[in-house]
């Protein structure tokens, strides 16, 4: 039997309209964007793209820390039918520049500190570099770009009203087999490889997510701690949640056990998506010291008491 999958952007579009005035993206202890805010910022990105001359199928690189604005820029690229190129911000600045050129990216979204460290003497395919911190123009081939974009965006409302939500989120959704992402990862050999990911793969993972994570819905919250430049974190801490109308909280700082546990306690996420390294850090720093106490060691050997201890540790963690 042939399974017909919905295009991710079609599902995202529906979520935007259904959850218009509800929170969509937050930076932990920072700014929050509702679905309306997000849709407005996406529309403003599209103005920038038009001024740069970006065309469907063109590449746009993103290299910055995890944050709400990274997600907005990523979604703006897809809803413009361009191809997103996520790059780990931990890579050396010149490597980021090389990957942007290797992918033939026309625009780079990054942090000012990263852009300042990239070698500008090399030939580049980039026509514009945009700050992820505030969406300002850091550099452009057209010296009038910042001024012309600002003038056009000034005509737009600060946030589009609900009456215009269908119009502002009327995204030009392409074919499900279109290229969505070129993902650069270090790989086992240590050299970055550009993996070409079509929307079909994203749609397939959404279907998988609905089967294994049915508890995620429009009341759910998640703490995004994995790199958005890696597909696991991007898919199951951001894209799947937004398509469900959930609220994503980004840890934009180093995800140390202390910061992670503090965020989990405050946000109270519906699920926690992690990798073994993070779980191991939490265990070594928070769980193991408790279990090694003399009284606790004894309690863990007594039927009934062991469950009380485990539940107490669990409640203190989350």
Identify the role of each PLM range:
Residues 11, 52, 79-162:
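Structural core segment of the AMP-binding/adenylate-forming
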Residues 11-34, 189:
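AMP-dependent adenylate-forming
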Residues 20, 150-184, 191, 215-221:
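Conserved pre-ATP/AMP-binding loop-to-beta segment of ANL
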Residues 24-67, 71-75, 92-97:
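Conserved AMP-binding/adenylate-forming core of the ANL superfamily
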Residues 34-36, 180-206:
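Conserved AMP-binding A3 loop
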Residues 89-121, 205-223, 256-270, 316:
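Conserved ATP-dependent adenylate/AMP-binding module captured primarily in the ANL superfamily
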Residues 203-221, 228-312:
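Conserved AMP-binding/adenylation subdomain of ANL enzymes
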């Amino acid at each position: 039997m042939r399974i017909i999958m919905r295009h991710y952007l079609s599902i995202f579009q529906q979520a935007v309209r259904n959850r218009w005035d509800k929170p969509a993206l937050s930076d932990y202890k920072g700014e929050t964007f509702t679905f309306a805010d997000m849709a407005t910022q996406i529309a403003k990105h599209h103005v920038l793209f038009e001024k740069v001359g970006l065309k469907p199928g063109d590449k746009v690189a993103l290299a910055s820390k995890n944050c709400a604005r990274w997600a907005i820029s990523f979604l703006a690229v897809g809803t413009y039918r361009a191809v997103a190129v996520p790059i780990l911000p931990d890579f050396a600045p010149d490597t980021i520049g090389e990957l942007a050129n290797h992918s033939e990216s026309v625009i780079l979204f990054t942090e000012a500190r990263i852009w300042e460290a990239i070698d500008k003497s090399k030939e580049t395919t980039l026509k514009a570099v945009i700050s992820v911190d505030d969406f300002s123009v850091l550099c452009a081939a057209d010296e009038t770009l910042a001024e012309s974009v600002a003038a056009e965006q000034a005509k737009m409302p600060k946030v589009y009203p609900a009456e215009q939500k269908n119009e502002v989120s009327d995204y030009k959704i392409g074919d499900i087999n279109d290229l969505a992402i070129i993902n650069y990862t270090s790989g086992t050999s240590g050299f970055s490889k550009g993996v070409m990911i079509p929307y079909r793969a994203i749609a397939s993972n959404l279907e998988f997510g609905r089967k294994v994570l049915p508890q995620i819905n429009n009341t759910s919250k998640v703490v995004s701690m994995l790199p958005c430049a890696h597909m696991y974190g991007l898919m199951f801490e951001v894209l799947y949640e937004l398509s469900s109308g959930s609220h994503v909280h980004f840890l934009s700082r180093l995800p140390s056990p202390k910061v992670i546990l503090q965020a989990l306690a405050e946000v109270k996420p519906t699920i926690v998506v992690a990798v073994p390294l993070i779980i191991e850090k939490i265990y070594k720093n928070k769980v193991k010291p408790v279990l090694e106490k003399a009284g606790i060691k004894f309690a863990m050997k007594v039927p009934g008491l062991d469950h009380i201890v485990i539940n107490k540790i669990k409640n203190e963690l989350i």
